[in-house]
Amino acid sequence: SPVISFKNYSFQYRAQKRPTLTNINLDIYPGERVLIAGPSGCGKSTLAGCINGLNPCSNPGEATGELIIDGVDATKSSIFELSAHVGTVLQDPDGQFIGLTVGEDIAFSLENSCMPQDEMHQITRKVAELVKINNHLDYAPHELSGGQKQRVSLAGVMVDQVKILLFDEPLANLD
C-alpha cells in the first residue's frame, strides 16, 4: 500500500483567494523516489508542507480531500504525530537548527525521546559520519558553510529513522 496517498486533495492558504493545490491524486509507494519539479510559486513547497504537517498546522489554511501519510490521516493529525513518520530537510537549513553545536542539533530528537546518553552519542556519531560532518560535531551551526548546514539538517532527520524523507530544494546550498 502507498506510504503517501493524496485523493482529491486541495489546500488553500487562508490569506489567498484560490487554492494553491487543487484535486491532487497521487500515490507514492515504499522505496519510490519522487521528484516534484516546476516553476517558482507552483505549489511544490505547499505540497511538501501538507505531507510534513506544516500546512495547515503552522501555515493556516483549509484542506479538503484525503491525505494519508504512512497509514495516518494527515488531515486529522498534529505536526508532532506526522514528524514521527516524515523527516524534512528545508531549503534554508538555518530555520531547523536548535542545538548550540552540530552534535547537539543532530541528537536533538534522540534527547527529547529520553534515549540513554551512550546510545545517543553512538547514533549521532554514526549518522554524522554517513553525511561526512563528523569532524564538525563541536562547531556551532553558524560556523558552517551552506552545504555543511544541509548535511547537519539531513543527519538530524536521519537519526529518527523515519520512513519518509522529504527534501525541499535540498541542493540549494550543497557544496
Where are the regions a protein language model picked out?
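ABC ATPase NBD Q-loop/coupling interface
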Residues: 66-81
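Conserved ABC ATPase "signature" region
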Residues: 118-136
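Short helical segment in ABC ATPase nucleotide-binding domains corresponding to the A-loop/adjacent helical element
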Residues: 52, 94, 100-111, 121
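Hydrophobic anchor residue at the start of the ABC signature
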Residues: 154
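A short, flexible loop at the N-terminus of ABC-type nucleotide-binding domains that lies
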Residues: 3-6, 11-23, 55-60, 76-78
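Catalytic Walker B motif of ABC-type/P-loop ATPase nucleotide-binding domains
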Residues: 165-168
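Conserved ABC ATPase signature
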Residues: 140-144, 148
